[in-house]
Curated annotation (Swiss-Prot):
Its main location: nucleus. Residues 198-257 bind DNA. The lineage of its organism: Eukaryota, Metazoa, Chordata, Craniata, Vertebrata. A motif (Antp-type hexapeptide) lies at residues 180-185. Sequence-specific transcription factor which is part of a developmental regulatory system that provides cells with specific positional identities on the anterior-posterior axis. Keywords: Developmental protein, DNA-binding, Homeobox, Nucleus, Transcription, Transcription regulation. It is found in: Nucleus. This is Homeobox protein Hox-A5a. InterPro entries: Antp_homeobox (IPR050296), HD (IPR001356), HD_metazoa (IPR020479), Homeobox_antennapedia (IPR017995), Homeobox_Antennapedia_CS (IPR001827), Homeobox_CS (IPR017970), Homeodomain-like_sf (IPR009057). The gene is hoxa5a. Belongs to the Antp homeobox family. CDD domains: homeodomain. GO terms for cellular component: nucleus. PROSITE patterns: ANTENNAPEDIA (PS00032), HOMEOBOX_1 (PS00027), HOMEOBOX_2 (PS50071). GO terms for molecular function: DNA-binding transcription factor activity, RNA polymerase II-specific; RNA polymerase II cis-regulatory region sequence-specific DNA binding.
Length: 274
């Protein structure tokens, strides 16, 4: 509730003693201190008072003095807006059992501004509690030192677990990969095109592939590019493999013919004697 709304009642009702407070509920159970407004203590307004105080700014004659009201409003008007809601909240929580039959509290009077200092002193405590809840690991106040120690003790196991977690993948990799020594390597066994030390893998042809290549070599010892592509697709081989096979087959054919010619020459020379 704004301070403008609270102080507006002071101007409308200057003579507070002429207005009597209403007492609701059972007269036997109700508290007697709510009936007389002139004998009430100023510190009870924020905690147990359910009526409205209309005795502020009165002189001895019972008339309202405008200068006193203006001075009291200017000095304490900054603390009114901040403490109105907290005072109303404390009033409802503290008087639940004693004044259950009483009506809802009215707006705070003008004189409660001077008695709002106990409430304003509790506001920093609420702020400290709020800071400790939002940032439990911060050192904003002395009451959070134990919380800081707890946070430090909780964070240290997490930091200790990080190196252990980071070291586990290396151990797993070491266990899954067996150690290979140089003498265990077999250079001549490789399925890649370019093996270690630049040695190419040996291609193993099936019986069907060898038979088809021999038929093609019987008709044509040299292949064109178009025919090489057709054979490669038919036998599921690469053009390079087809070319190398034909090169090796021609070398073998030349070697065989050379041996035949040498045998024929040696045999004919031995028979013929001039």
């Amino acid at each position: 509730m704004s301070s403008y709304f609270v102080n507006s009642f002071c101007g409308r009702y200057p003579n507070g003693a002429d207005f009597q407070l209403h007492n609701y509920g059972d007269h036997d159970t109700a508290d007697e201190q709510y009936r007389n407004s002139t004998t009430m203590h100023s510190t009870r307004y924020g905690y147990g008072y359910n009526g409205m105080d209309l005795t502020v700014g009165r002189d001895g004659t019972g008339h309202f003095v405008g200068n006193e009201r203006t001075r009291g409003y200017s000095e304490n008007h900054s603390a009114t807006a901040a403490s109105v809601e907290s005072v109303r909240y404390n009033q409802t929580t503290n008087t639940t059992g004693t004044s259950s039959l009483s009506p809802p509290p009215d707006p705070l009077p003008c004189s409660s501004v001077s008695s709002a200092s106990p409430v304003t002193e509790t506001q920093p405590q609420h702020r400290v509690v709020k800071n400790s809840v939002t940032t439990p690991c911060s050192s904003s106040s002395g009451g959070t030192l134990l919380v800081n120690r707890d946070c430090a003790s909780k964070s240290s196991p997490l930091e200790e677990e990080k190196p252990a977690g980071g070291a586990t993948p290396q151990n797993v990799n070491d266990s899954t990969q067996p150690q290979i020594y140089p003498w265990m390597r077999k250079i001549h066994i490789s399925h890649e095109l370019s093996g270690p030390e630049g040695k190419r893998a040996r291609t193993a042809y099936t019986r069907y592939q060898t038979l088809e290549l021999e038929k093609e070599f019987h008709f044509n010892r040299y292949l064109t590019r178009r025919r090489r592509i057709e054979i490669a697709h038919a036998l599921c081989l690469s053009e390079r493999q087809i070319k190398i096979w034909f090169q090796n087959r021609r070398m073998k054919w030349k070697k065989d013919n050379k041996l035949k010619s040498m045998n024929m020459a040696s045999a004919g020379g031995g028979v013929y004697r001039p």
